[in-house]
């Protein structure tokens, strides 16, 4: 065998004396050590081919090219006569990747990071990349305050040049902040400044935001908060000179020192606007008006810039540039703002597209749009479309993206990206409710029927005191102008005595239809007609019931429990809704007002009217809308007409999971007062002329309920389910009263409360959990009443299935 000559042994060294400057002609190329990589693939990566004349530079380039493929750990090129012999050692193939000891970082996140670095099962292993990954992960742990953390990549060889890769984590504990010092502050105390930070050296029990665990990212945010605090108060020359973070020897404690220069306070002297204002100079200048002498404020400058961009966006200028340059006059301590505006090009909308609506038809989404194709782009119109899609309640999330059309200087496409949620359910089963006992339920409810936007429901309930069935359907776009049409038919067999109400049974059925007329983006008026037949029996007349029967000319016996009558009523139904909530379910911002009313029309056996008003307002207290304050009210009032009273079975009730939690359902308010009484009533005798109090709730013709809730992130729930679960702490208050109640001497002598007094307010406080389950919204609450009256029944734990209010 001819002696083999070593040409080059590494990337960084080549021998220029082996072949001389002229080199030699390659007749053939042979490989040694190839296993997974095909010969053809290796040859294609080389710059040398048989027949080429090669020299030292060509050999160096060949080695570099083979290394660049990422398939080889070692490459050597030798000459055997006129043949190039390429000896390679392939990198091992990754057979599996596992993790151990990682608690702060999830496996999925680690896999994504590894894949982004080219480390995945089936690929070759680059040990250099592993070292970078180890260091990068350790740097991550250091950034969140875990300075004792270590990450080690363990490679286990397997047959056929394969390896198992295991990343072993030792996370350690988070270093806690021992002290935060601010040096150079004179205008504000250190405690006052630190109170605006997320990082704290002391965290009171009530502070749910502060944290003693050091994180580099949070420190950067706190430094920006500190800068904004000063800039918003006129300190235009404020500067953070340096920041020192010191670690204790045991790596468990952190000391932070922030050195600052406050400077003096500066006032605004004026604003000068220049640039391409696109013909909207008057509107832009109105946004930049200031009161001379006002303190300089960085946040006001940012707000002004955002206002200008938003204004131009409404006129089709999708990408305006607004830059503010402060001119600081140190002599008189003033700042003049120079605002330069470049409106840029004006854009048309070529197309509006929807992504993610696998169930909902495009037409259902498109009819909610206020931005039109072929028209100037209006950022406010695009945002209105997003708001309207959110309020439908069909989607978990709605995002918008304005994309420039390639090759066009003045066209964009608007893309709405939605994530659909389950808007329907089918259920059949047996359950137990704290307010209804054993319950049998069957139903189909679909708020977006076959993706058409129709709401269709077939529901039935059977429990201890009620048998109910209903079919309903609503077309939200009965006309192209957005007039809605809805209707329902129902049957209800209700035994009030079994529901802890006064004694009567009501079998009713009816039908109604309603048209909804949109007034503008946020207001809708409703009008409709209804018919209901009520067949009452097993009535044991109590005072309020007796009063009603007398007003309609019906007679009843105090000695009989089998009084009864039937009534047919036709009603004109009306309503108004104002809705500016940010989404249809689990809102976090905005308000909703809902007014409903009905009044009987000629041909009815009864003559009365009834009104209810519901309000809800959400106030987010953080930018992510995870912490929200919710205020709710419910008001109700009804009365008779033409000398008649409103039917007792139309009364308002309070208590239970939808009104005042912690009290038994419908238990708040007036109680039945019977003539003569029965064995369960508080009577000294069975004298028919005597009135006897009881614990049977009868409701009233007036109601007021209020609630204040603090919505918080739900512990132990991942971000994936954050939009499906809601936790809140609440305070509820409410009362029901009877404006027609006569507080006579006989009633007072019998110890009966004055049920016409609206001041008998009940209160409770507790915690609630809501879950958007496949069966519908499930609401669990635990409440403790802290203001109640004789006869009230408590029920601390409650749950129900139904719509959130």
UniProtKB/Swiss-Prot annotation:
Q: Where, in residue ranges, is this chain on the Extracellular side?
A: 434-435, 463-465, 496-504, 536-563, 601-608, 640-700, 738-762, 785-798
| Alphabetical list of Pfam families matching this protein | Omp85, POTRA
Q: Which residues lie on this side of the membrane: Periplasmic?
A: 21-424, 447-454, 476-483, 507-522, 578-590, 620-628, 711-724, 773
POTRA domain location is: 24-91, 92-172, 175-263, 266-344, 347-421
Q: Name one GO biological process term.
A: Gram-negative-bacterium-type cell outer membrane assembly
Superkingdom, taxonomy of origin = Bacteria
Q: Report the principal subcellular site.
A: membrane
Which subcellular locations apply to this protein?
Answer: Cell outer membrane
Q: Keywords assigned by UniProt? A: Cell outer membrane, Membrane, Repeat, Signal, Transmembrane, Transmembrane beta strand
Q: Which GO terms describe its cellular component?
A: Bam protein complex
* Span of the signal peptide: 1-20
Transmembrane portions of the chain: 425-433, 436-446, 455-462, 466-475, 484-495, 505-506, 523-535, 564-577, 591-600, 609-619, 629-639, 701-710, 725-737, 763-772, 774-784, 799-803
The family line of this record is: Belongs to the BamA family.
Task: Fetch the PANTHER family from UniProt.
Answer: OUTER MEMBRANE PROTEIN ASSEMBLY FACTOR BAMA (PTHR12815:SF23), SORTING AND ASSEMBLY MACHINERY SAMM50 PROTEIN FAMILY MEMBER (PTHR12815)
What does this chain do?
Answer: Part of the outer membrane protein assembly complex, which is involved in assembly and insertion of beta-barrel proteins into the outer membrane. Constitutes, with BamD, the core component of the assembly machinery. Does not normally serve as a receptor for CdiA-EC93, the contact-dependent growth inhibition (CDI) effector of E.coli strain EC93. However if extracellular loops 6 and 7 are mutated to match the sequence of E.coli then the protein is able to act as a CdiA-EC93 receptor, conferring CDI on E.coli strains expressing the mutated BamA. The same mutations also support the delivery of CdiA-CT from strain 536 / UPEC.
* Assembly information from the UniProt record: Part of the Bam complex, which is composed of the outer membrane protein BamA, and four lipoproteins BamB, BamC, BamD and BamE.
What this protein is called in its record is: Outer membrane protein assembly factor BamA
């Amino acid at each position: 065998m001819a002696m083999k000559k070593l040409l080059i042994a590494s990337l960084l060294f080549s021998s220029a004396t082996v072949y001389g400057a002229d080199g030699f002609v390659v007749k053939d190329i042979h490989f040694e050590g190839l296993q997974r990589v095909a010969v053809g693939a290796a040859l294609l990566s080389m710059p040398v081919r048989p027949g080429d004349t090669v020299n030292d530079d060509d050999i160096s380039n060949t080695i570099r090219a083979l290394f660049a493929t990422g398939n080889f750990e070692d490459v050597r090129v030798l000459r055997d006569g006129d043949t190039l012999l390429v000896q390679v050692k392939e990198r091992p193939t990754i057979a599996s990747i596992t993790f151990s000891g990682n608690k702060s970082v999830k496996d999925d996140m680690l896999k994504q990071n590894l894949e982004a670095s080219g480390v995945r099962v089936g690929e070759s292993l680059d040990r250099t990349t592993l070292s970078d990954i180890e260091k990068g992960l350790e740097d991550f742990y250091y950034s969140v305050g875990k300075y004792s953390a270590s990450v080690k990549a363990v490679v286990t060889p397997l047959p056929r040049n394969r390896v198992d890769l295991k990343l072993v984590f030792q996370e350690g504990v988070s270093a806690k902040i021992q002290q935060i010092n601010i040096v150079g502050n004179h205008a504000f105390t250190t405690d006052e400044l630190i109170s605006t930070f997320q990082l704290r050296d002391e965290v009171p029990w009530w502070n749910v935001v502060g944290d003693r665990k050091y994180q580099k990212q949070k420190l950067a945010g706190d430094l920006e908060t500190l800068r904004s605090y000063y800039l918003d108060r006129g300190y235009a020359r404020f500067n953070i000179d340096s920041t020192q973070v010191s670690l204790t020897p045991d790596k468990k404690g952190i000391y932070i020192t922030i050195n600052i220069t406050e400077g003096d306070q500066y006032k605004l002297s004026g604003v000068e606007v220049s640039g391409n204002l696109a013909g909207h100079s008057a509107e832009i200048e109105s946004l930049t008006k200031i009161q001379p002498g006002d303190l300089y404020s960085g946040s006001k400058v940012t707000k002004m810039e955002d206002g200008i961009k938003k204004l131009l966006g409404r006129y089709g200028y999708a990408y305006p540039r607004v830059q503010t340059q402060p001119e600081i006059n140190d002599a008189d301590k003033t700042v003049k703002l120079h605002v330069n505006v470049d409106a840029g090009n004006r854009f048309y909308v070529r197309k509006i597209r929807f992504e993610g609506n696998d169930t909902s038809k495009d037409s259902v989404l498109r009819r909610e749009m206020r931005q039109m194709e072929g028209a100037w782009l209006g950022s406010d119109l695009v945002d209105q479309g997003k708001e309207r899609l959110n309020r439908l309640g069909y989607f978990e999330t709605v995002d918008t993206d304005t994309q420039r059309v390639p090759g066009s200087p003045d066209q964009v496409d608007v893309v709405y990206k939605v994530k659909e949620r389950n808007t329907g359910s089918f259920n059949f089963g047996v359950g137990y409710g704290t307010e209804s006992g054993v319950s049998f339920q069957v139903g189909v409810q679909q708020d977006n029927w076959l993706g058409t936007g129709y709401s269709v429901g077939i529901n039935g309930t059977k429990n201890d005191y009620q048998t109910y069935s209903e079919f309903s359907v609503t077309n939200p776009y009965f006309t192209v102008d957005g007039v809605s049409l809805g209707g329902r038919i129902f049957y209800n067999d209700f035994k009030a005595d079994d529901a802890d109400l006064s004694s009567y049974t009501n079998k009713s059925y009816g039908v109604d239809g309603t048209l909804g007329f949109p007034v503008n983006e946020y207001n809708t008026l409703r009008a409709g007609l209804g018919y209901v037949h009520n067949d009452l029996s097993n009535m044991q007349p109590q005072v309020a019931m007796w009063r009603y029967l007398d007003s309609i000319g019906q007679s009843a016996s105090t000695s009989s429990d089998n009084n009864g009558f039937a009534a047919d009523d036709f009603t004109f139904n009306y309503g108004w809704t104002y809705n500016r909530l940010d989404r249809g379910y689990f809102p976090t911002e905005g308000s909703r007002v809902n007014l409903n009313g009905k009044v009987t029309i000629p041909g009815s056996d009864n003559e009365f009217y009834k009104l209810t008003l519901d309000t809800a307002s959400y106030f987010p207290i953080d930018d992510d809308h995870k912490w929200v304050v919710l205020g709710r009210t419910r008001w109700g009032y009804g009365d008779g007409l033409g000398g008649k009273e409103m039917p007792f079975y139309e009364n308002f009730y309070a208590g239970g999971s939808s009104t005042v939690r912690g009290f038994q359902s419908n238990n708040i308010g007036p109680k039945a007062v019977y003539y003569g009484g029965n064995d369960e009533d508080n009577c000294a005798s069975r004298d028919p002329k005597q009135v006897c109090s009881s614990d049977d709730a009868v409701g009233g013709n007036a109601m007021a309920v209020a609630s204040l809730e603090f919505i918080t992130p739900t512990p132990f729930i991942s971000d994936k389910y954050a939009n499906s679960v809601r936790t809140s702490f609440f305070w509820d208050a409410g009362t029901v009263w009877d404006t027609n109640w006569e507080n006579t001497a006989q009633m007072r002598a019998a110890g009966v409360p004055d049920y016409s007094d609206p001041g008998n307010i009940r209160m409770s406080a507790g915690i609630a959990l809501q879950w958007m389950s496949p069966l519908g919204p499930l609401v669990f609450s635990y409440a403790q009443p802290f203001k109640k009256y004789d006869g009230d029944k408590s029920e601390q734990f409650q749950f129900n299935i139904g719509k959130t209010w």
